[in-house]
Amino acid sequence: MAARLRTKYKKEIVPELNKKFKFSSIMQVPRLEKIVLNVGMGEAHTNPKALEAAVEELALITGQRPVKTKAKKSIAGFKIREGMSLGCMVTLRGDYMYEFLDRLVNVALPRVRDFKGVSEKGFDGRGNYNMSIKEQIIFPEIKVDKINTLYGINMTFVTNSKSNEEAYSLLAAFGMPYRNQK
């Protein structure tokens, strides 16, 4: 069974965006290619258990095992050596991506305290959107009483659109709650 948002994309969003931007083919309609989640933990070199907990929690959130990210260079001021594990990341594609986006928009973001919407300033000019959350506990898969450290998660939504406006419309059609909805 296909993910709910994938079905919505094919049946509702593609015709809507094709009509709005007047593409000559439906293959020109922007689509979500992947979502990359990244956790950077500065304390990982002094507390390896915190990184292991972050890996397990990110696996719970996404349904996919993250890969540990390693330092590219040694930095003496931060007591970091080349090859040290400093964080973890996961790349979501296909049904995992659509399921995660569905949970993020409909469950996790509304659980953020004093949530007014996500910023529109996260677009990079090439149709990709970056955002971050301050605490991982907004996801229902995370049990608050088993948390040792709070950390933020950076998310990058990669689309094949050519402009920010197309990517904005695509994510808004998926239900992304922007602060000043256009």
From Swiss-Prot:
GO terms for biological process: translation. The keyword Glycosyltransferase does not apply. One of its GO terms (cellular component) is cytosolic large ribosomal subunit. Pfam families: Ribosomal_L5 (PF00281), Ribosomal_L5_C (PF00673). Keywords: Ribonucleoprotein, Ribosomal protein, RNA-binding, rRNA-binding, tRNA-binding. InterPro entries: Ribosomal_uL5 (IPR002132), Ribosomal_uL5_bac-type (IPR020930), Ribosomal_uL5_C (IPR031309), Ribosomal_uL5_CS (IPR020929), Ribosomal_uL5_dom_sf (IPR022803), Ribosomal_uL5_N (IPR031310). The keyword tRNA-binding applies. SUPFAM superfamilies: RL5-like. GO terms for molecular function: RNA binding; rRNA binding; structural constituent of ribosome; tRNA binding. This is one of the proteins that bind and probably mediate the attachment of the 5S RNA into the large ribosomal subunit, where it forms part of the central protuberance. In the 70S ribosome it contacts protein S13 of the 30S subunit (bridge B1b), connecting the 2 subunits; this bridge is implicated in subunit movement. Contacts the P site tRNA; the 5S rRNA and some of its associated proteins might help stabilize positioning of ribosome-bound tRNAs. Belongs to the universal ribosomal protein uL5 family. PANTHER family: 60S RIBOSOMAL PROTEIN L11-RELATED. Part of the 50S ribosomal subunit; part of the 5S rRNA/L5/L18/L25 subcomplex. Contacts the 5S rRNA and the P site tRNA. Forms a bridge to the 30S subunit in the 70S ribosome. This is Large ribosomal subunit protein uL5.
